[in-house]
Amino acid sequence: ARVLESESPILVRESPYPIEETVAKVKTAIGAVNMRLIRVQTLDQGFVADGQENHDQVIVYACDFGFLNEALKVDPRVGLFLPCRVTVVRHAGKVQVMSINPKRLSRIFNNAELNDLCEQMHQVYVQILEESTL
């Protein structure tokens, strides 16, 4: 089997909503795909003093633990990209929602056994990004 080819290392959608509303929509979309919300934090949390965080860069962490176990059985290196993360950024007046492109993982790890799992996760990420920016 050959390793999946993919177009871009990241998936990006532009949101028509303010960043706070977009983050709320990402959280709702995560629940809609049966993932568990782990935490929400600013990108710089822990690197700056409390109260000084940049709220224009927010990471939403989530996981589907059943899927996680399946993926780790195929290739434990997948753990490097866990938990799943969706990043919401406000820059130059625009709000963007982004994540890694899971189709790249089979290529990065040179493991064709990951193809089906990466394709499934790609669909999940696309669904989250699209649902949160509708």
Q: What name fits each language-model region?
A:
Residues 85-110:
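Beta-strand/loop substructures that line and gate deep hydrophobic ligand-binding cavities in soluble
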Residues 2-39, 134:
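Terminal, regulation- and interaction-focused segments at domain boundaries
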Residues 32-87:
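Compact, glycine-rich, soluble single-domain proteins
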Residues 27, 44, 126:
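Short glycine-/small-residue-rich flexible loop motifs, especially phosphate/cofactor-binding loops
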